[in-house]
Every structure is written in C-alpha cells, then in structure tokens.
Design a protein with these regions (language model features):
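Charged, alpha-helix-enriched surfaces in structured cytosolic catalytic cores
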Residues: 161, 291, 333
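Extended amphipathic alpha-helical segments enriched in small hydrophobics
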Residues: 285-293, 297
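Short polar catalytic/cofactor-binding loops
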Residues: 280, 344-345
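Catalytic alpha/beta active-site cores
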Residues: 1-279, 284-285, 303-306, 310-319
Length: 350
C-alpha cells in the first residue's frame, strides 16, 4: 500500500472507530498514540535510532548478546543486626549460588551516626547492618575474599568513608585496590528529593562525590563510583518519564561538577552506573529502558564529548517496584506469573 492510500485508509478507520475510542481514553499524562503505522516511521534512521546490540547508541543493550550470553549479577539486598550476623548471611547466600553481595546499612550508618548515639535508639541493625568502625567492616567481610566477589554498598552520605573502610579491609586481606570490583550508591541529590539520608549541605556533598570519582578512576578502575538513583525517585511518586528525567538531571549535575573540578569525562564516566525501577506496565517499561539507553548515549557523546564506549553506556541495576506490592495480597507479590515475576520479565525483554 502506497503512502496516500495508507493515509486515506487511516483517516477512514479513525472516523469509523471514533465513538468507540472516546469511551476508552488514553492516560492524559502520557503522550502516546493508540495506533501506529509505517507513516510514523517514514524518517526512521536505523543506525541512529536503533543500531546494533552492544554498539552506540546502545538502544538494544550495552552487550552484543545481553543476558543470553552473560547473565546479570545476582545479589540479594541483605544486611541486619551486627556485622557478624550479616557475615554469616553473606556466606550462606554465596554458598547458595549468589554471584555478588549487596550490603544494606541501617539508618544510623546511612546518616553517619554511631550505634550508641541517642538518635540511633530503636534503629540499630533494623533495616540493615550497623557499621560503626573499621572493626565492624572487617567482621562484615571476614572469610570473604574481596578479590573474588563484587560488592554493592547502598550508602550515600558517608559513601566515601565506607569505601575507604572497604579498601582498608581488602588491603588487610592482601588485595590491592585495583583488583576490587563493586559499587557505592553515592547519589546524594536523590536523597534531598526522595529519601532524606543526607548529612552535609549540597556543595560539600557534591565535592565528596567528585573526589570519589577522581580517586577511583586512578586507583580502583573496576569500581562503579556512583549508582544514580532513578528507582527512589519513581518510588517517591514519579512517572516512568519523570524517573528518567530527574535521574538524568542529577547525573548531569555530577558530571558538570567533576568536569569543573578538572576531571576528564572519559576518565570518570565509565564508573557511572544506575538503579532503575521495573514496574508493571509491560510496553512502558521496555520502551523506558530502550529510550533511556539511547538518550544517555547521545547526551554523553554530543553534550560531553565522551569517546570511550563505556562512558556512553547506561549500565543499569534494576529493582522491582516495591510500591506495587501489598501486604494484604502477599501471595500475588512474589509468584513468577504475578507482580514481581512480571516486573522481572519486562526488564529481560528490553
């Protein structure tokens, strides 16, 4: 069918179904057409908009075969009570087949308070492990060779301090910093707008983050120096579009600050990683991740002049959306064919 006939047929179709469509409107806050035809992709540039898997603009993934060729790191978010108790849990998880560690810190640790501080009362070891000293960090990873495991630490305000402790524990094990692999969340801007576990004002907090960028790029090249928190913003009430927009704005602020401090984008940007939400909207979530990969690649290349492929990639860790789960329907939360299973499926499909 040529273009004119297709347009004529589309016009006739829309007129015919207008009354039925009016009874079932689309979401007002989300711009999307009900029907797409070849007319919508007349100017579609395959290389620019889609490309090949593992190549710029990474729409189809940052690896050529994605999860069929390389499974994602599997790590349960874990931490509770004392360092010794959490250490036992980590060893159990690793023996059970987990391929990385994800450290949950308690709220006093997240805001830089010792466990015996009066404001810590009732919160010590409650939503994560309590880390007050280097001795606690040594106990947390006792018997776990840090050159053999990738460790993600969900910590923001005192992230630089916890990273320094981790490096010290590794050195005590005889492991050099350049052999370490892992991530610190280290995203303070989303704490101001979505969570609240900040310690210092924005400017000194940003300096700590950019200093961490520089240190890691020179000494711990395999370390992800930040995990930009789109997830927390979404869980605080943002839409799929806002999730990307606000997280990208925060990430660009970090990049601008690092460049202003004299760092080169190709040196520190490969250490930028992300944490996104996987929600229940199948097509919306798949489109979100694919669009975000392409948009971020263009921002890094065109705005910041990044030439190293890893500096252009949107490397993502995903959490399924806790906001869609309900205590009243707990059996619907976890099963493979229901909420969490469906959210995981959406991520695998993008």
């Amino acid at each position: 069918m040529d273009k004119e006939k297709l347009q004529q047929g589309l016009n006739e179709y829309e007129a015919k179904v207008a009354k039925a469509v009016a009874k079932f409107p689309e979401r007002k806050n989300f711009e999307a057409q009900r029907l797409y035809t070849p007319l919508d992709i007349e100017d579609f540039d395959y290389g620019e908009k889609l490309g090949f898997p593992g190549q710029y603009p990474f729409t189809r993934g940052v690896q050529p075969t994605m999860y069929r060729g390389r499974l994602w790191t599997m790590r349960a978010y874990a931490g509770f009570a004392t360092a010794e108790e959490t250490n036992a849990r980590y060893k159990y998880l690793l023996e059970a087949g987990q391929t990385g560690l994800s450290v949950a810190m308690d709220l006093p640790t997240q805001i830089g308070l010792d466990s015996d501080h009066e404001l810590s009362h009732g919160e010590v070891g409650k939503v994560g492990v309590a880390i007050d000293s280097l001795a606690d960090m040594e106990a947390l990873f006792d018997g776990i060779p840090l050159d053999k495991v990738s460790t993600s630490m969900t910590i923001n305000g005192p992230a630089a301090v916890l990273l320094a402790m981790y490096v010290a524990v590794a050195e005590k094990q005889g492991v050099k910093p350049d052999a370490l692999k892992g991530t610190i969340q280290n995203d303070i801007l989303k704490e101001y707008i979505a969570r609240g576990t900040y310690i210092f004002p924005p400017r000194p907090s940003m300096r700590l983050i950019t200093d961490t960028f520089e240190y890691c790029s020179k000494n711990i090249p395999k370390w992800n120096t930040i995990s930009v928190g789109a997830y927390h913003i979404r869980e605080a009430g943002a839409s799929e579009v806002q999730e990307i927009a606000f997280a990208f704005a925060n990430a660009m602020a970090y990049i601008d600050a690092a460049i202003k401090a004299g760092q080169k984008v190709d040196d520190f940007a490969p250490g930028i990683s992300w944490i996104f939400t996987a929600g229940l909207d199948f097509f919306g979530e798949v489109a979100k991740f694919r669009a975000a990969r392409r948009l971020w690649a263009r921002i890094m290349k065109e705005r910041y002049g990044a030439s190293v492929p890893k500096a252009q990639m949107l490397r993502v860790h995903v959490h399924t959306a806790g906001s869609v789960l309900t205590a009243q329907q707990h059996l619907n939360n976890r099963s493979e064919e229901r909420r969490v299973g469906k959210e995981c499926w959406r991520v695998c499909m993008c």
